[in-house]
Swiss-Prot record:
It is found in: Cytoplasm; Mitochondrion intermembrane space; Cytoplasm, Cytoskeleton, Microtubule organizing center, Centrosome; Nucleus. Disulfide bonds: none annotated. GO terms for cellular component: centrosome; cilium; cytoplasm; midbody; mitochondrial intermembrane space; nucleus; spindle. Interacts with GTP bound ARL2 and ARL3; the complex ARL2-ARL2BP as well as ARL2BP alone, binds to SLC25A4/ANT1. Interaction with ARL2 may be required for cilia basal body localization. Interacts with STAT3; interaction is enhanced with ARL2. Found in a complex with ARL2BP, ARL2 and SLC25A6. Found in a complex with ARL2, ARL2BP and SLC25A4. Interacts with STAT2, STAT3 and STAT4. InterPro entries: ARL2BP, BART_dom, BART_sf. It holds the Pfam family ARL2_Bind_BART. This is ADP-ribosylation factor-like protein 2-binding protein. Belongs to the ARL2BP family. One of its GO terms (molecular function) is transcription coactivator activity. It comes from Rattus norvegicus. Ubiquitous with higher expression in brain, especially in hippocampus and cortex. Also expressed in lung, cerebellum, liver, kidney, spleen and heart (at protein level). Together with ARL2, plays a role in the nuclear translocation, retention and transcriptional activity of STAT3. May play a role as an effector of ARL2. Keywords: Cell projection, Cilium, Cytoplasm, Cytoskeleton, Mitochondrion, Nucleus. One of its GO terms (biological process) is positive regulation of tyrosine phosphorylation of STAT protein.
Length: 163
């Protein structure tokens, strides 16, 4: 059996569960990028970002905020997935996600992690607070734009094409 036959053989046996998983991830990407979801998440973060401080200690007030976030955002995503994929089961997807976590785009996995990992949730809020307060990562001083074209001593305004 040559390499091409082995490759097509492997592709033909990808399971139905893999195809379902890929479909859910595709829908998740669409949902997360949708303006309605962005507004929902941003509004929630605007409401609470000042509560979070970059310290080792976690305040007791973080727990109800975390629970409210899970309730609001996870419920929204699950409703959207049910509209797009009838019979969708979040618990089954979460289990499958653990087996496929290396295959999921970082942004999606990070966002899903905020439902189950409190530290990821807190980090999301700390990043948002830093951004709101102008303390975000500024790469502008490290960026240099260089032309790939040969430099000419003639100013661009005088570079007319003549026939």
């Amino acid at each position: 059996m040559d390499a091409l036959e082995e490759e097509s053989f492997a592709l033909s046996f990808s399971s139905a569960s893999d195809a379902e998983f890929d479909a859910v991830v595709g829908c998740l990407e669409d949902i997360i990028m949708d303006a309605e979801f962005q507004l929902l998440q941003r509004s929630f973060m605007d409401k609470y970002y000042q509560e979070f401080e970059d310290t080792e200690e976690n305040k007791l007030t973080y727990t109800p905020i975390f629970n409210e976030y899970i309730s609001l955002v996870e419920k929204y995503i699950e409703e959207q997935l049910l509209e797009r994929i009838p019979g969708f089961n979040m618990a089954a997807f979460t289990t499958t996600l653990q087996h496929h976590k290396d295959e999921v785009a970082g942004d999606i996995f990070d966002m899903l992690l905020t439902f189950t990992d409190f530290l990821a949730f807190k980090e999301m809020f700390l990043d948002y607070r830093a951004e709101k307060e102008g303390r975000g990562l500024d790469l502008s001083s490290g960026l240099v734009v260089t032309s790939l074209c040969k430099s000419s001593s003639t100013p661009a305004s005088q570079n007319n094409l003549r026939h």
